[in-house]
Amino acid sequence: IVTAKYWHQAEDGGLHFTVAETGWAKASWGKIYGQWLIGSAVMVYDFDNFDPKQLTSVINHYGVTSFCAPPTVYRYLVRKGIPDMPTLKHASTAGEMLAPEVFHRFKEQTGLWLCEGYGQTETTLLMANFKGDHAVEGSMGTPSPFYHIELRGKNGKTVENGEVGEVVIIPEKAGRQPGVFTAYLDDEEQYRYVWRDGVYHTGDAAYMDENGRYWFHGRFDDIIKTGGFRVGPYEVENVLMEHPAVVECSVIGVPDPLRGQAIKAVIVLDTSYEPSLELELEIKNFCNQKLAEYKWIRFVEFVTKMPKTISGKIQKHVLRSQNESL
């Protein structure tokens, strides 16, 4: 109900469409049941290949009123031009970081606020920019009333506002929390690891501002450790997305004998640009002028497409595995 009514803002008599494989956990709590319970019909459309252009045709053909999709879909739309979607009243996104540029351009072209949310396969919706609260670009929003959430440091203690910590869930009852998974199939060791010290460890890093809003810093697996600093990839990616040549990007850490890890940008170019050394230097300079020196991009790779999940989420672990011996 929280997801459907207060994040997706699905309506009684409306038609909701979430881009999520129907075999996923999110399909049950973020695509079907909550929307039904508040009286909305549900658009179920599974596809073999990710095609954002096709999604807008579906929205208009069937008269979708509320829509949720990964940022990849919205990035494509603002780059290629958003067609008129007169029935669409509410738009939301989750799955990876949404660049501020995409947030603002979508608002300019449609008049709709993109409401970000955050959750995991192991949970339901944990945080979001909820109905009645002004959506803020880049923010995970505020916690769902269903959960007690804290940010904790390596010492297990709650961090101060503005400090990065791990998102953890404090269960209502000892060792149990409604809405959180109860086991990993055939992996009891991993289950005990994430449910340690009496709390559930998400593995996600974030910080909270003075207004109680949370901001994603990165998966701990994705955070780049370079020259003694810890860099969240999304800050660098947001700057990259401001360059007109960049359609998609993913920032990863690659082995570096001097720094431990160096920052590498994997980039899909707009069709009006061609890969070249000159363009690589231009993009590096464009970004590095806006970033602290320890966040500078050291390597660039141009690719024609990114490895993605069926819903369009970029798979950073695949990119990292391809660059282990760089």
Task: For the regions a language model picked out, list residue spans one by one.
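Conserved ATP/PPi-binding loop(s) of AMP-dependent carboxylate-activating enzymes
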Residues: F146, K157-Y193, V231
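Active-site glycine-centered loops adjacent to acidic/histidine catalytic or metal-binding residues
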Residues: E21, G95, G119, G141, ...
